[in-house]
Amino acid sequence: MGIARSINSFMFFFFLMILSNASKSSVLAEATTAKFTFIGFKENQTDIQTEGASTIQHDNDLLRLTNRKQNVTGTAFYRKPIRLRELTNSSDIKVCSFSTSFVFVILPSSPGNGGFGFTFTLSPTPNRPGAESAQYLGLLNRTNNGNPSNHVFAVEFDTVQGFKDGADRRGNHIGLNFNNLSSNVQEPLIYYDTEDRKEDFQLESGEPIRVLIDYDGSSETLNVTIYPTRLEFKPKKPLISRRVSELSEIVKDEMYVGFTAATGKDQSSAHYVMGWSFSSCGENPMADWLEISRLPPPPRLSNKKGYNSQVIVLIVALSIVTLVLLVLLFIFVMYKRRIQEEDTLEDWEIDYPHRFRYRDLYLATKKFKESEIIGTGGFGIVYRGNLSSSGPIAVKKITSNSLQGVREFMAEIESLGRLGHKNLVNLQGWCKHKNELLLIYDYIPNGSLDSLLYQTPRRNGIVLPWDVRFEIIKGIASGLLYLHEEWEQIVVHRDVKPSNVLIDEDMNAKLGDFGLARLYERGTLTQTTKIVGTLGYMAPELTRNGKGSTASDVFAFGVLLLEIVCGNKPTNAENFFLADWVMEFHTNGGILCVVDQNLGSSFNGREAKLALVVGLLCCHQKPKFRPSMRMVLRYLNGEENVPQIDENWGFSDSSRDDHKSNVVGYVSSDRASSSNTFSSFSNVSSSSIVSGR
């Protein structure tokens, strides 16, 4: 009997559990699509619950969230609760997908004095009792801000900088808020144009602005797109696209959707919604598109204070005088700008790489802080920076009071901006701000080749291994071959040396600092009036005619090749020339004796001898006997036999003295022409021109 009673009790409770779960499943299963569209609000005012300063205006059919009075709040919610949780196929409960679209206008009390903004909100109640004005946006207050029991999610449209003195980095931004007014995600207001360029605009512009918010319940991804309705296209890329798993902790079974807004002390705006559509649950819910031509006209600024005629006359008179002064000031500024030709749009500004905003670079380099300097020279200073969109960068700020510096800037834009090769430093973009010229490169973490060859004590006590050196040599050769023969125009680098070779994290060589590069149409003569380059790497013909060529680049490469193998600088002493020294050992049959002693016996003798002989061939005193970079690479890859070195290879004592005196004469008489350049990414100090580094 007792056993039967126990069985009956168990079956009764089991039946109740089934009924409970079935009831819950039934309720959640009823999470049918909630969908509404408001083209204006006058005819649908019974569907909207407004409180505070919020009201539906019958004269213009708009939903006004706040007027321009100070320290007011307003809320407007869809009157019916919306089910936002549903059962999945695996009987789990998730937040439904939903989509909303609305068009809004913000009219500040006066230019620069608008505030504070508004939110699109998911709330457990159709109002926000106790919510405060100003930075709390009519959503929360100082007591409950950050409380998990709020169950509030908001997309904020903030026009004033700084919640709690800085949690919000800047005004005119969009943020995602979870139970808190400190945004978890925050983006400055921009849209992406048809060419995927960023274009900024203002929330308080007074023009209609469209917002599209879409949440995918399966991937928990929220997309927010915002742009002025004057555009004839919808941006393909949203401003915010983030996974927001936090919603599952915030959203209850039923929530209210709507808006909150607030003004502050001395900062106030009227916030309007022209139209609103919403759709949730179901399969791929999509809010209806709001056709601008069907929406009520946007609001206009008006003055309802009824100024007397004398005040109006005074205001009009002052306005006319101010306008005349502004026109005169504008004419004066334009005249000065034309005279100074400041920030004029050159042809190369249109045709070449992406232009960065100066403000972004200013912030990325911590306001060009001295501690972020990683190099000097080459007519400018190089800063380390970090962009949130693309990561670490190097910013080369070119000295603006140097005509040579301007020419260098244009040369780099012309060359690097259109070059693309794995052994060339990548130029991300450029910026011209007032009198400042800036180039933005990839940041190369290992710095320059000379820092790896000569740094004392050696980095981490490790000597650059032979196999790495040999690959670096071939990498530099490959980059020069691309410049000389494989691009659409011939590019003469004119300053090949270790400090202009960058080494990336995989120890690949990248040729950089094209500040002295010049483009030559194929078949034309070079027209150079000044000697440029670095002592020790300059071909002898440069001291006679100053004409840089691919052959002079080959000479500099030859010196650099010998330097990498030997671990010696090209002119370490008064009468020491590295190429002559190597040639002497080659003549005596002991060429491997010149290999860097720090390598010990850890090098490939065949490769070392091959590299040294190729280096000597490149250093021939006569340009016509030097190999092309294509032949150099074939020699190094073992695809061609290396020829014998010509018996007229070297310099006589008198020609060597003439070469040295001519170079020193040029350097001392025209310092601006010499290239004591510094790699845009190296973190070592610039070397003196006398040492050739």
UniProtKB/Swiss-Prot annotation:
Membrane topology, Extracellular segments: 23-311
Subcellular location: Cell membrane
Signal peptide: 1-22
Membrane topology per record: Single-pass type I membrane protein
Listed EC numbers: 2.7.11.1
Positions in the Cytoplasmic compartment: 333-693
KW Membrane (keyword) present: yes
Region (Disordered), start-end ranges: 670-693
Binding site for ATP: 374-382, 396
Region (Legume-lectin like): 33-279
Carbohydrate-modified residues: 21, 44, 71, 89, 141, 180, 223
Listed PROSITE patterns: PROTEIN_KINASE_ATP, PROTEIN_KINASE_DOM, PROTEIN_KINASE_ST
A GO cellular component entry from the record: plasma membrane
Catalytic activity, as annotated: L-seryl-[protein] + ATP = O-phospho-L-seryl-[protein] + ADP + H(+); L-threonyl-[protein] + ATP = O-phospho-L-threonyl-[protein] + ADP + H(+)
Pfam family, any one: Pkinase
GO molecular function: ATP binding; carbohydrate binding; protein serine kinase activity; protein serine/threonine kinase activity
Chief location bin: membrane
Active site: 495 (proton acceptor)
Keywords: ATP-binding, Cell membrane, Glycoprotein, Kinase, Lectin, Membrane, Nucleotide-binding, Receptor, Serine/threonine-protein kinase, Signal, Transferase, Transmembrane, Transmembrane helix
Segments passing through the bilayer: 312-332
Keyword Membrane: yes
Family: In the C-terminal section; belongs to the protein kinase superfamily. Ser/Thr protein kinase family. In the N-terminal section; belongs to the leguminous lectin family.
Name this polypeptide is given: Probable L-type lectin-domain containing receptor kinase VI.1
Source organism of this protein record: Arabidopsis thaliana
Lineage of source species: Eukaryota, Viridiplantae, Streptophyta, Embryophyta, Tracheophyta
Gene: LECRK61
